[in-house]
Amino acid sequence: VYATPFACGLLRRKLSETGLERRVPITEVPTGGGFSVKPFSVDFIPLAHSVPETQALVIETPAGRVLHASDWKLDPEPLLGPVTDEEGLRAAGQKGLVAMMCDSTNVFVDGHTGSEGPLRESLADVVAAQTGRVVITMFASNVARMESGIKAAVANGRSVCLVGRSLFRIAEIARECGYLQDCPEFVDSRDVGHLSRENVLILATGSQGEDRAALARIAQGDHRDITLQGGDTVIFSSREIPGNERSIGRVQNALAKQGVRIITERDEFVHVSGHPSRDELRTLYGWVKPPLLVPIHGESRHLLEHRRFAEENGVPATAMAENGQVMRLAPGPAEVIDHVPSGRLGVDGNRLVPAGGEVLRARKRI
């Protein structure tokens, strides 16, 4: 595995939790760096995204050069890390590409995705307007948002408590990589009950309503240290991922029954996406001028719309593949030529079974 320092830190920690750290060789590559695995060579181009050190990949092959840009946005004030490297992307296009793979997440969204900079100010203002205990839930991997939540607490005289194992893990790795350096030490969740409700802010996992995440346990009254009551507030600093509406709704209903105020991106400016909207996609097409676009990172309707949108905006050719399909990009026109096994696997004793297979379906029914 080749990755930037932050991703390597996450991977090493996950592997160590399962006893696999010695079985997976990991090579750390600096942001903007590169590596070779013959017959391929790969160069990194820094991109702004909600996860630190996100990189586009310029993959050199004997058949041509491919640009893979999965998660990115054009954020003038990303807060952690550099802005998206326009010069590097232009240079990749000028060298000549066979194809570009590109993020499709926000292809239905007009305009330009918001910036983390103004969001930080807004989040502090929203917290300032609350009088009771405040919980902010977010994607744990969004270190810039975590830092914004911490700074919102500090600006309003509140101590910060992290609740959720993934938040602790990512905060530790972020600090090891040089992030979150100006943030205070966190309060242990066991000590929250000794603090005045208006003097604490809790960062919690579970923005998507995950059953065993911290926020769901707090909402159900199952958390051993954290309780909420009327006058408290939960801020969802995240988007509602399609398919998670019911689980998020269950958590929000449980909170509402306790008299907790719920604030989402529909109510206040508390979230921005980490993915490009239509104006940014147009800009990238102009910088790179890809001869062929392969839309990635989205459901079928996103990929199909991105294909249509790219053709409408001057990209000469597009192609689309589904998970497990093998696509030949060159020589000749792009086409699917094979299939490989894909999808999630579950561990059943000492064997791997398909996550959607009969074994796991039967256990869920039981």
Language-model segment annotations:
Residues 1-195, 213-227, 246-249:
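His/Asp/Glu-rich metal-coordinating catalytic cores
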